[in-house]
């Protein structure tokens, strides 16, 4: 249900976009793909699990394999992890409740299309809105992820300190966003499209969406 939010944010940046119904499949040769937030299939079974097994995800994986930029946001991040586009999994928040609030993110890797507008260590404010946003992954796989510089963002406080108190959902090592095997595929739980329009609040999320320019 965040598809229109994503379209509005992209079009505010001058990026033409269209909403594609899952049953219709992807148009040929898209310049980029956003898997938006929402509650696909009511989040039954696990958030993103059923949507990850729909035929259009075969199209998305094929596009990603060909080098098309793919960004999964919130439920789109859950779908991305469930479909194997990115490592790890997103599970129930430590609080065991839905959380909708602004959070701070620290940029961990600025050498990607999604973070080219920032510097390493920059702190941006972007809202979250999820009940299953806690990032989990085996310790050895997390170590490999960190060694490969595939962590995009971590939850932090306003000063950029990654602390347990600043971690809204209990994500392992404060991870808020990660890259796939290649840096043109990324997922994150916070909503950059909700931090892109100056008439509703901070615009720190614009830099992420500018990867589609």
Each model region followed by its residue ranges:
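N-terminal beta1-alpha1 cap of cysteine-dependent amidohydrolase-like domains
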Residues: 1-73, 80-87, 91-98, 106, ...
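Alpha/beta-hydrolase-fold enzymes
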Residues: 91-122, 128-129
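Sequence-level detector for tyrosine residue identity
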Residues: 41-44, 104, 118, 155
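Glycine-rich His-Gly loop
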Residues: 37-39, 75, 131, 190
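Short acidic/polar capping segments at secondary-structure boundaries
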Residues: 76-78, 85, 96-97, 109-112, ...
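C-terminal and late-domain segments of enzyme folds
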Residues: 9, 114-213
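Hydrophobic, well-ordered secondary-structure segments
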Residues: 76-77, 102, 142
